[in-house]
């Protein structure tokens, strides 16, 4: 059961002490993400756990572009391997609006191939909470054979996820 395991977001915390609080607290407003990085990590975790309702509810309505809960449920559903957050920031504009960005690589395996979503995601703070708006995709380069594995196992890539 995931509740007593390390959270998929990469925080090294137990899921119930990490993203589960955000996943369960969203509807009640009891616990909301406090910054873009926390929201992005909780969204990655929601993808891993197939909590697509959370994905839709944390995606700003003006940027959904027709994305629906049903589409997310239909897939495809890759095997998520690991998350690397490369940078994160949030800023307040001169007009008082708040926004932020998070650059990350979300590694996955699908049809026997390893790849990553390498993205600079944009976030906006509205209605007292953070929302994902859009992402700008970049090309991800696979690690070298002797580099640390993308799943953060501590093994070399060639001895872990690269093996199959």
Swiss-Prot record:
Classification of source organism: Bacteria, Pseudomonadati, Pseudomonadota, Gammaproteobacteria, Alteromonadales
Matches recorded under InterPro entries: NTF2-like_dom_sf, SEC_C_motif, UPF0225, YchJ-like_M
Protein name: UPF0225 protein Shewmr7_1921
Domain of life where this protein originates: Bacteria
Gene3D superfamilies: 3.10.450.50
Family listed: Belongs to the UPF0225 family.
PANTHER family reported in the protein's UniProt record: ADENYLATE CYCLASE-ASSOCIATED CAP C-TERMINAL DOMAIN-CONTAINING PROTEIN, UPF0225 PROTEIN SCO1677
Pfam families tied to this protein: SEC-C, YchJ_M-like
Species of provenance: Shewanella sp. (strain MR-7)
């Amino acid at each position: 059961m995931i509740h007593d395991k390390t959270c998929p977001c990469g925080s090294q915390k137990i899921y119930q002490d990490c993203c589960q609080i955000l996943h369960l607290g969203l509807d009640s407003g009891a616990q909301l993400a406090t910054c873009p990085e926390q929201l992005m990590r909780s969204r990655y975790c929601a993808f891993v756990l197939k909590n697509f309702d959370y994905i839709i509810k944390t995606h700003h309505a003006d940027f959904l572009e027709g994305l629906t809960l049903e589409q997310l449920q239909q897939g495809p559903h890759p095997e998520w391997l690991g998350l690397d957050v490369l940078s994160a920031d949030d800023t307040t504009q001169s007009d008082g609006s708040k926004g932020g960005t998070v650059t990350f690589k979300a590694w996955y395996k699908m049809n026997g191939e390893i790849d990553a979503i390498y993205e600079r995601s944009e976030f906006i703070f509205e209605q007292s909470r953070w929302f994902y708006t859009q992402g700008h995709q970049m090309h991800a380069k696979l690690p070298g054979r002797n580099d640390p594995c993308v799943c953060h196992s501590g093994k070399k890539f060639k001895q872990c996820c690269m093996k199959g």
